[in-house]
């Protein structure tokens, strides 16, 4: 670097420190990108720019990375630590060649790799983005282009507070040298590949160019499918084509988003303030996987679970904060009220009616609009459950949007389409008390401005929030495996609905929901709620609660549920203290210490938070309950019993293990419970360690209400094998309600009809019932007996008595 360059850069540092407030993506590149600090590092930037290199320098030093302006010493040679892939524009010329100095650095590095087989230089592509505003659709400029001095000065002044420094995955020059050689042409090839990479970086951060709304409507009106639907509408209603077209325009206006970058930018600041006011921190996991998908050009469809209206805002905020484009969000038409509707619409929401069966014009327009979003490359988000979960459990998926996504693919899309499951968790859901009232029969209050104002007035500290991105599902690959000839059904009109569609969509929906649950976030409140609700009086001493949380943490860490779920790093003591700070527990003291308990009202509300993570403990809890109630079993008997019950748990709780994995998972859980001193194994027999039985009993009770529900249905069926499906569901629900009242079961889902309906689908799948509803009596009686054996005597007696009274 010349002395003139050094001097000019020194002069720039002060104004840049005042004008530029940039963000690093990812926030911890050393960990997220697996950068090895013991190996040499070189930075690659898209354009020659002193402003960019100084901005990069600031972040590199803050993040513990080498200074890009320091020299790189390798085997006695001193090299520049950065390269520019393109020259900078000037006022007089628009140069776009690769600077010779960069080619020299690449060539020198490759030759050093040829001489030293141990050398591995890491190239870190880094892009400094000044503003993230997407362009207009008719703009033919490239996504990423060099700026001359005046343009860069303007960018610093106008977008200095909206600057991103994006670090990309490391490129190993050792790998390049081994795979492609070390001659001089490889240096030019590296530069060409880097240009494409940097352009994709910009596209991933800003998104595709945006059309004007009217231009979008005009394009949709020209689609053959909508023209045909308008003609059919005019004919069926006996109105003119013009009137039917006006109706179509009104529907488009009702549906379509009106994305505004300025609102997103301002909204990010407002939401940042809101999250800081509401929550004690947002924990985000696995965002790097999604960034890579966006950068690789995937059409991304986000499918989050739906806990709260906050979900709409939270996911968009997190994606923007992580350097990605907020998606277009399918929102219920009930949210299209003033002033929320226009704000949501500018934030990317497009609105969907709850039902449009039989309305061909509406369904055609909605399908075409969704296909247009996919075709233009906008990421999309929809809540696969169809509505917010009132119980805290994941609901069975509504498959309509998923089917329309597949239909959009059948138009012949060029880019891969990928579903990204998202688990959203809270230590406080602001609607949870309302959910409890609705489950007790209160009518749902319609969303309106006054409801929003009342909610805002209640804003207070809600603990922590969690956004975990689950394992992506690449739809092209999924269809190749489950409908190998799907490409033969490609139809540009988008009307194709092949025979394989329904079964494939249903299986895909289950896989999607399973991946959401796989990414669950455990936290202080969900763990404490699980423990307290498992105690008979909803109360534990502080020592017992801490001990139980330690049991849960050890299980989750030593027998991990999945690759994408998260466990708190805090100690059990700290988790209990944090949960107490949320003011949801009663704390009383006596001479022996603190007792932490739940009152009746909070007991009902806490079931919501327990249900968020109940699937993580389903198998450990089942094994614990089995050994407690049967006082000792062989390992083979435990394996056999778990195999019988597992299909029902898997269907209801979207458990991730396949049946062929069960044996090893059960063995690992038993080993862990032995390691924790709760079980003893001798001569293949598993027994309880009586000196440490409380933790095992609390663990077992987590699943006991689920087993009670199964026991009601199976024993009712065993006693009355001729009952049809609707009678069986109704009688099971009635008995569950009675059992709940008699034994103080507060869980709202305990007698939920939907849960029973799901169970009966599994009865058919497992051949307890045939397709005509006929019962395999011997098999049913055997299973009913197994379920009875895992219940406490007083509960079993109530069920037996209720079944006889129901006959």
Swiss-Prot record:
Its main location: membrane. It holds the Pfam family Acyltransferase. Transmembrane segments: none annotated. Its EC number is 2.3.1.15. Keywords: Acyltransferase, Cell inner membrane, Cell membrane, Lipid biosynthesis, Lipid metabolism, Membrane, Phospholipid biosynthesis, Phospholipid metabolism, Transferase. It is a peripheral membrane protein. A motif (HXXXXD motif) lies at residues 305-310. It comes from the Bacteria. GO terms for molecular function: glycerol-3-phosphate O-acyltransferase activity. GO terms for biological process: CDP-diacylglycerol biosynthetic process; fatty acid metabolic process. The keyword ATP-binding does not apply. CDD domains: LPLAT_DHAPAT-like (cd07993). It catalyses: sn-glycerol 3-phosphate + an acyl-CoA = a 1-acyl-sn-glycero-3-phosphate + CoA. Pathway: Phospholipid metabolism; CDP-diacylglycerol biosynthesis; CDP-diacylglycerol from sn-glycerol 3-phosphate: step 1/3. GO terms for cellular component: plasma membrane. It is found in: Cell inner membrane. Belongs to the GPAT/DAPAT family. The HXXXXD motif is essential for acyltransferase activity and may constitute the binding site for the phosphate moiety of the glycerol-3-phosphate. PANTHER family: DIHYDROXYACETONE PHOSPHATE ACYLTRANSFERASE, GLYCEROL-3-PHOSPHATE ACYLTRANSFERASE. This is Glycerol-3-phosphate acyltransferase.
């Amino acid at each position: 670097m010349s002395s003139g360059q050094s001097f000019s850069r020194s002069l720039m540092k002060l104004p840049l420190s005042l004008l530029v407030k940039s963000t690093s993506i990812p926030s911890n590149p050393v960990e997220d990108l697996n950068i090895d600090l013991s190996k040499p590092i070189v930075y690659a930037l898209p354009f020659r720019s002193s402003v960019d290199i100084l901005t990069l320098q600031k972040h590199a030093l803050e993040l513990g990375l080498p200074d890009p302006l320091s020299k790189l010493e390798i085997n006695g040679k001193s090299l520049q630590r950065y390269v520019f892939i393109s020259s900078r524009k000037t006022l007089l010329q628009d140069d776009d060649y690769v600077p010779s100095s960069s080619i020299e650095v690449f060539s020198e590095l490759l030759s050093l790799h040829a001489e030293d087989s141990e050398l591995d230089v890491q190239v870190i592509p880094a892009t400094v983005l000044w503003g993230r505003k997407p362009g207009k659709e008719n703009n033919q400029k490239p996504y990423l282009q060099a700026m001359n001095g005046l343009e860069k000065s303007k960018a610093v002044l106008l977008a200095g507070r909206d600057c991103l420094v994006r670090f990309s995955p490391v490129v190993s020059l050792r790998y390049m040298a081994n795979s492609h050689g070390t001659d001089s042409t490889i240096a030019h090839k590296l530069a060409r590949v880097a240009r494409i990479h940097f352009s994709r970086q910009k596209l991933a951060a800003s998104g595709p160019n945006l059309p004007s709304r009217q231009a979008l409507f005009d394009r949709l009106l020209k689609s053959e499918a909508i023209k045909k639907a308008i003609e059919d509408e005019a004919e069926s209603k006996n109105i003119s084509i013009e009137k039917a077209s006006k109706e179509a325009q009104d529907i488009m206006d009702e549906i379509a988003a009106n994305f505004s970058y300025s609102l997103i930018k301002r909204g990010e600041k407002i939401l940042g303030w809101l999250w800081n006011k509401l929550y004690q921190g947002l924990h985000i996991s696995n965002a790097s996987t999604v960034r890579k998908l966006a950068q690789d050009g995937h059409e991304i469809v986000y499918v989050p679970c739906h806990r709260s209206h906050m979900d709409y805002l939270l996911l968009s905020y997190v994606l923007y904060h992580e350097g990605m484009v907020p998606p277009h969000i399918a929102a219920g038409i009930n949210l299209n009220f003033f002033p929320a509707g226009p704000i949501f619409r500018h934030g990317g929401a497009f609105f969907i009616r709850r039902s449009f069966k039989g309305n061909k014009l509406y369904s055609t327009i909605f399908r075409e609009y969704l296909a247009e979003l996919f075709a233009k490359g906008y990421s999309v988000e929809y809540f696969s459950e169809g509505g917010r979960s009132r119980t805290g459990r994941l609901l069975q998926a509504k498959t309509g949007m998923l089917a329309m996504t597949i239909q959009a693919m059948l138009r012949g899309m060029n880019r891969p389409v990928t579903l990204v499951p998202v688990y959203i968790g809270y230590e406080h859901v602001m609607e949870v008390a309302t959910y409890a009232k609705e489950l007790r029969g209160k009518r749902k209050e319609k969303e309106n401005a006054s409801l929003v104002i009342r909610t805002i007035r209640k804003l207070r500290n809600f603990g922590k929030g969690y956004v975990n991105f689950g394992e992506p599902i690449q739809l092209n690959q999924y269809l190749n495996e489950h409908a190998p000839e799907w490409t033969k059904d490609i139809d540009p009109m988008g009307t194709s609905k092949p025979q394989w569609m329904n079964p494939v969509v249903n299986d895909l929906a289950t896989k999607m929901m399973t991946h959401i649950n796989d990414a669950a976030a455990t936290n202080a409140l969900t763990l404490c709620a699980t423990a307290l609700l498992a105690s008979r009086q909803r109360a534990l001493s502080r020592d017992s609660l801490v001990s139980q949380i330690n049991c849960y943490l050890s299980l989750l860490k030593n027998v991990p549920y999945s690759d994408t779920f998260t466990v708190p790093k805090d100690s059990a003591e700290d988790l209990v203290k944090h949960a107490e700070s949320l003011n949801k527990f009663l704390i009383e003291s006596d001479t022996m210490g603190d007792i932490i308990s739940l009152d009746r009202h909070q007991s009902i509300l806490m079931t919501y938070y327990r249900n968020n993570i109940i699937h993580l403990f389903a198998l450990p809890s089942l094994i614990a309950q089995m050994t407690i109630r049967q006082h000792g079993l062989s390992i083979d008997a435990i394996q056999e019993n778990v195999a019988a019950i597992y299909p029902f748990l898997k269907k209801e709780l979207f458990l991730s293990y396949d049946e062929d994995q069960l044996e090893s998972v059960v063995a690992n859980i038993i080993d862990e419970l032995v390691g924790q001193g709760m079980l003893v194994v001798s001569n293949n027999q598993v027994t309880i360690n009586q000196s440490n039985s409380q933790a095992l009993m609390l663990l077992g009770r987590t699943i006991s209400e689920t087993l009670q529900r199964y026991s009601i249905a199976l024993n009712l069926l065993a006693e009355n094998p001729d009952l049809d499906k609707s009678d069986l569901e109704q009688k099971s629900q009635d008995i569950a309600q009675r059992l709940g009242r008699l034994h103080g079961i507060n869980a709202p889902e305990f007698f939920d009809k939907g849960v029973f309906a799901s169970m009966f689908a599994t009865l058919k799948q497992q051949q307890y019932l045939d397709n005509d509803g006929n019962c395999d009596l011997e098999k049913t009686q055997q299973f009913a007996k197994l379920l009875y054996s895992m219940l406490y005597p007083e509960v079993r007696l109530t069920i037996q008595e209720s079944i006889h009274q129901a006959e």
